[in-house]
UniProtKB/Swiss-Prot annotation:
GN (gene name): glcG
Result of knocking out the encoding gene: No effect on glycolate utilization.
Phylogenetic placement of the source organism: Bacteria, Pseudomonadati, Pseudomonadota, Gammaproteobacteria, Enterobacterales
Factors inducing expression: Part of the glcDEFGB operon, which is induced by growth on glycolate, under the positive control of GlcC. Also induced by growth on acetate. Expression of the glc operon is strongly dependent on the integration host factor (IHF) and is repressed by the global respiratory regulator ArcA-P.
UniProt name for this protein: Protein GlcG
Protein source organism: Escherichia coli (strain K12)
Family the entry assigns: Belongs to the GlcG family.
InterPro entries with a match to the protein in the record: GlcG_carb_metab_protein (IPR052517), PduO/GlcC-like (IPR005624), PduO/GlcC-like_sf (IPR038084)
Superkingdom: Bacteria
Length: 134
């Protein structure tokens, strides 16, 4: 029988805190969303001075990374390389900044970050997701 780690509220809070720490270290203001492996929102934080729309975008990035079991950067690259049909895919945000959360080799959810450039969003998301690997 397989066992599965479940992304708890405590874990989601730790992910948010790690993402905020990375953002603050760089004087950035972002929105950070954490979703379970089904793409359902568990936690959301929009830092001071972050645009309100970033809260929505971060949730969509987290959901896409959770359901797709991959970084959202891959979808953005597909679109940029000519696979434009991906922009019409339901429940898919093809913007960099969504990263799966992996524990013991299993994807247990995802974190999405918005408010900066795609690369900066991804930097914060990766730092946030890495907190559970420690």
């Amino acid at each position: 029988m397989k066992t599965k780690v479940i992304l708890s509220q405590q874990m989601a809070s730790a992910i948010i805190a790690a993402g905020q720490e990375e953002a603050q270290k760089n004087n950035w203001s972002v929105s950070i969303a954490v979703a379970d492996d089904g793409g359902h929102l568990l936690a959301l934080s929009r830092m001071d001075d972050c645009a309100p729309i970033a809260a929505y975008i971060s949730q969509e990035k987290a959901r896409t990374a959770a359901l797709g079991r991959r970084e959202t950067k891959g979808y953005e690259e597909m679109v940029n390389n000519g696979r434009t049909a991906f922009v019409t895919a339901p429940l898919l945000t093809s913007l960099e900044g969504g990263v799966p959360v992996v524990v013991d080799g299993q994807i247990i959810g995802a974190v999405g970050v918005s408010g900066l450039t795609g690369a900066q969003d991804a930097q914060v998301a990766k730092a946030a997701a890495a907190v559970l690997a420690k």
